Amino acid sequence: MDLTPREKDKLLIFTAGLVAERRLARGLKLNYPETMAYISAALLEGARDGQTVAELMHYGTTLLSREQVMEGIPEMIPDIQVEATFPDGTKLVTVHQPIA
């Protein structure tokens, strides 16, 4: 299977997102890489499902709460930016204050 570097990056984000999802389901608090992967993967999947940039910007703020991540993580992530592929091309999705 020949994948472009961009496809490899998306696959890595998706895989790390699955690990984070499983840990969250077990009641574990997510660390920084897990938090980034969880939110990024959800945004990429949302774009694939046809959501708009504006919808994803809001959706990204609803995925995790302070109680679901380790102490200090919300302050480490003032925003998340993900390049997602939409039906009309690639766009940058920015989520400000993703963890409320």
From Swiss-Prot:
EC number: 3.5.1.5
Nucleus among keywords: no
Family that this chain belongs to: Belongs to the urease gamma subunit family.
Subunit (UniProt): Heterotrimer of UreA (gamma), UreB (beta) and UreC (alpha) subunits. Three heterotrimers associate to form the active enzyme.
Source species: Pseudomonas fluorescens (strain ATCC BAA-477 / NRRL B-23932 / Pf-5)
The entry's keywords: Cytoplasm, Hydrolase
Protein name (record): Urease subunit gamma
One GO CC annotation: cytoplasm
Gene that encodes the chain: ureA
